[in-house]
Amino acid sequence: MMELIPQPRTKFLRVQCPECNNEQIVFGSPATVVKCLTCGKVLVEPRGGKGKVKAKILEILG
C-alpha cells in the first residue's frame, strides 16, 4: 500500500564527542562541517548526502 504522506528520510542524531564527552544534537545530513561546541573537534562531515559521523551516536531522534 502506498504512503499517503511520505516521511522524511533525514534524522537528527544525539552524539557524544570522543574528546570531551559533550552531548550534542546534530543533523544527519549536514551541508557544512559540524564541530563540538565545547572543544571544537569535528563531529560530522558532509558527504554529498548523509554525513560521515565521527562521534558516538547515542540516539536517533525522529
Swiss-Prot record:
Record-level GO BP terms: ribosomal small subunit assembly; translation
Any single Gene Ontology cellular-component annotation: cytosolic small ribosomal subunit
Binding positions (Zn(2+)): 17, 20, 36, 39
GO molecular function, one term: RNA binding
Required co-factors: Zn(2+)
Matches recorded under InterPro entries: Ribosomal_eS27, Ribosomal_eS27_Zn-bd_dom_sf, Ribosomal_zn-bd
C4-type ZnF: 17-39
Keywords: Metal-binding, Ribonucleoprotein, Ribosomal protein, Zinc, Zinc-finger
Pfam families linked to this entry: Ribosomal_S27e
Signal peptide positions on this chain: none
Cofactor note: Binds 1 zinc ion per subunit.
Subunit structure and binding partners: Part of the 30S ribosomal subunit.
Annotated family: Belongs to the eukaryotic ribosomal protein eS27 family.
Name by which UniProt lists this protein: Small ribosomal subunit protein eS27
Source organism (scientific name): Methanocaldococcus jannaschii (strain ATCC 43067 / DSM 2661 / JAL-1 / JCM 10045 / NBRC 100440) (Methanococcus jannaschii)
Upper taxonomic lineage: Archaea, Methanobacteriati, Methanobacteriota, Methanomada group, Methanococci
